[in-house]
């Protein structure tokens, strides 16, 4: 069986220290290879044409040409490359713009290796599926869209909720084998129960989480939560 080709990644980041950390993170993962690095949007455009990467890990806030204008130029010129955005901002305006330009994912600085790993793993699944299948079934499309649903819900968060924290809660819910209470989830992610409950209530309101009541032998029932299936 032929070995699958590595996914070619270009890193565009103006902070040398962050650039090196990102490089080390990506190189920890099988299936990916770094084909180039650059610190500016202008040089990034040159290297994108020259190296023809499959994926760009793109910093949004850079001097001269920032990431948003870089993405706009890429889309206007119909350059065939996917982008994962890296940003210090989690305001809805920036996130809406990134989503409209078709980024595959966005990572809010500072992010963990586990968060980047999750983003790249999801991207690799989509990338391999697109390579193998000339046409996608409805089930395949549904699964891909479902995976991006968590990102889409961050498009318009209520006041006081933050995309990075919401992502933490969602990631913990994805790991659960059985429903858990807000207190248990909060303990797992290092957040107060009342804080976690606000995010769980939001996820329930947008149809992404199911809440159920668990009755013990005494006392009031406990609200437990799990991701909605299907």
UniProtKB/Swiss-Prot annotation:
SUPFAM superfamilies: CheY-like (SSF52172), Winged helix' DNA-binding domain (SSF46785). Residues 8-124 form the Response regulatory domain. It holds the Pfam family Response_reg. Phosphorylated by DctS. SMART domains: REC (SM00448). Keywords: Activator, Cytoplasm, DNA-binding, Phosphoprotein, Transcription, Transcription regulation, Two-component regulatory system. One of its GO terms (cellular component) is cytoplasm. It is found in: Cytoplasm. One of its GO terms (molecular function) is phosphorelay response regulator activity. Coiled coil: none annotated. InterPro entries: 2C-system_Tx_regulators, CheY-like_superfamily, Sig_transdc_resp-reg_cit/mal, Sig_transdc_resp-reg_receiver, WH-like_DNA-bd_sf, WH_DNA-bd_sf. It comes from the Bacteria. The modification 4-aspartylphosphate is found at residue 59. Residues 183-209 bind DNA. Member of the two-component regulatory system DctS/DctR. Essential for expression of DctP. This is Probable C4-dicarboxylate response regulator DctR. It comes from Halalkalibacterium halodurans (strain ATCC BAA-125 / DSM 18197 / FERM 7344 / JCM 9153 / C-125).
């Amino acid at each position: 069986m032929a070995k699958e080709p590595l996914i070619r990644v270009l890193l565009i980041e103006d902070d040398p220290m962050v650039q090196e950390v990102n490089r080390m993170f990506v190189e920890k993962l099988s299936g990916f290879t770094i084909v180039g690095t650059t610190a500016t949007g202008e040089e990034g455009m040159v290297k994108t044409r020259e190296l023809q990467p499959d994926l760009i890990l793109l910093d949004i806030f850079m001097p001269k040409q920032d990431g948003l204008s870089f993405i706009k130029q890429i889309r206007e010129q119909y350059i065939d490359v996917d982008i994962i955005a890296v940003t210090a901002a989690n305001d809805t305006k920036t996130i809406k713009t990134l989503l409209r330009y078709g980024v595959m994912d966005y990572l809010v600085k500072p992010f963990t290796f586990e968060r980047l790993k999750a983003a790249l793993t999801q991207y690799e699944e989509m990338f391999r599926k697109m390579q193998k299948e000339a046409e996608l079934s409805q089930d395949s499309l549904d699964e891909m869209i479902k995976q991006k649903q968590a990102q889409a819900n961050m498009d318009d968060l209520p006041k006081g909720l933050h995309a990075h924290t919401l992502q933490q809660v969602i990631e913990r819910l994805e790991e659960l084998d059985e429903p858990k209470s807000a207190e248990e989830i909060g303990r797992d992610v290092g957040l107060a129960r009342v804080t976690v409950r606000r995010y769980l209530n939001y996820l329930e309101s947008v149809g992404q989480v199911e809440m159920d009541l668990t009755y013990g032998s005494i006392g009031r029932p406990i609200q437990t939560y799990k991701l909605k299936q299907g």
